[in-house]
């Protein structure tokens, strides 16, 4: 059975293995053991209530309960940009016009922005390619909404998610090559690594402070603004079906889109509800997949089950109850895994 659980110190070697499979571009999952250990420690201190809001972050892993294999990772930053500035570009427009010459040009322009300061962030989503099956990606991504719904007071009103931009298998980023490299004088992989290991001071020191006309970039770079890496397209679709939207903000390194949503408008958060759980043999039928989560802050768990999402009393097997760290009579959070398709 696949289970989402809180990260533990013993997970560091498994996270190193996952990091080695990302192919670069996932800034918050560098293949650096010291950085990953520090990330785990920060998550544990967050759960223990030892950190200020500006440093809080939760990390979860997807585990095969039978073998102990860690197949994926996902995380939530509680409030970005309160310690180190959180940069992105806002894609806007500057108009240059002359009535006398009968010239009017509306030019797409990149403006350096800190507009998402204080927002909660969905981040560090990565599923081992060998495990991309049977709803694991949905479980991994959406489990965070169950945690946010259960502990709403821990998070801010807006949630953002930076989507991985277009980078090839050799680490080549058209956006970086045309823009970032001119100011940072280093390869994309080097800048990405520095950022992922917490060495972010160089961004503020070297970033261009003035608006940038996108027409000055290569056509290849212009074409990838707001576009996602092919492997990230499913993750973008998942978030958009939950209510997230692209509002013309992009990553400063690879040009990937930043999606955002008001936390209380996220479908899985808005529609999740508490039901009583009982032990038994679940009813057979053509039921949809549903997320089921406990309400245990320190030992949070999420699993996928097929059940009636409208049920008032959820029947689970002993194995499912054990995976959730629950007992009969406890209340669990339930929501349909995917939004119902609208019919004409």
From Swiss-Prot:
One of its GO terms (biological process) is arginine catabolic process to glutamate. The keyword Transferase applies. Keywords: Acyltransferase, Arginine metabolism, Transferase. InterPro entries: Acyl_CoA_acyltransferase, Arg_succinylTrfase_AstA/AruG, Arginine_N-succinylTrfase. Pfam families: AstA (PF04958). GO terms for molecular function: arginine N-succinyltransferase activity. The keyword Nucleotidyltransferase does not apply. It is an enzyme of class 2 (transferase). The active site is at 229 (proton donor). It catalyses: succinyl-CoA + L-arginine = N(2)-succinyl-L-arginine + CoA + H(+). Disulfide bonds: none annotated. Catalyzes the transfer of succinyl-CoA to arginine to produce N(2)-succinylarginine. Belongs to the arginine N-succinyltransferase family. This is Arginine N-succinyltransferase. It comes from Shigella dysenteriae serotype 1 (strain Sd197).
């Amino acid at each position: 059975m696949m289970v989402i659980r809180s990260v533990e110190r013993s997970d560091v070697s498994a996270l190193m293995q996952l990091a080695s499979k990302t192919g670069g571009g996932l800034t918050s999952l560098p293949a650096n053991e010291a950085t990953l250990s520090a990330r785990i420690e920060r998550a544990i201190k967050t759960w223990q209530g030892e950190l200020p809001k500006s440093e809080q972050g939760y990390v979860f892993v997807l585990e095969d309960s039978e073998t102990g294999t860690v197949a994926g990772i996902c995380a939530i930053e509680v409030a970005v940009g309160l310690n180190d500035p959180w940069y992105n570009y806002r894609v806007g427009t500057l108009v240059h016009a002359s009535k006398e010459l009968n010239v009017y040009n509306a030019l797409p322009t990149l403006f350096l922005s800190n507009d998402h300061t204080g927002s909660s962030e969905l981040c560090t989503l990565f599923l081992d390619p060998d495990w991309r099956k049977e709803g694991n990606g949905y479980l991994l991504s959406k489990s965070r909404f169950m945690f946010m719904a259960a502990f709403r007071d821990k998070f801010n009103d807006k949630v953002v998610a930076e989507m991985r931009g277009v980078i090839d298998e050799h680490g080549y980023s058209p956006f970086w090559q045309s823009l970032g490299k001119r100011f940072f004088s280093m390869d994309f992989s080097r800048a990405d690594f520095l950022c992922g290991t917490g060495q972010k001071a160089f961004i503020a020191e070297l970033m261009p402070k003035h608006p940038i006309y996108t027409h000055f970039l290569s056509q290849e770079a212009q074409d990838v603004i707001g576009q996602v890496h092919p492997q990230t397209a499913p993750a973008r679709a998942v978030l958009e079906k939950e209510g997230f939207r692209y509002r013309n903000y992009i990553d400063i390194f690879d040009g990937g889109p930043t999606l955002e949503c008001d936390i209380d408008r996220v479908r899985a958060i808005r529609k999740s509800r508490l039901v009583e759980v009982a032990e038994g043999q679940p009813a057979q039928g053509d039921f949809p997949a549903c997320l089921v989560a406990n309400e245990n802050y320190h030992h949070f768990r999420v699993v996928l089950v097929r059940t009636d999402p409208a049920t008032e009393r959820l029947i689970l097997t002993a194995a499912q109850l054990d995976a959730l760290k629950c007992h009969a009579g406890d209340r669990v959070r339930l929501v349909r895994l995917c939004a119902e398709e609208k019919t004409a």
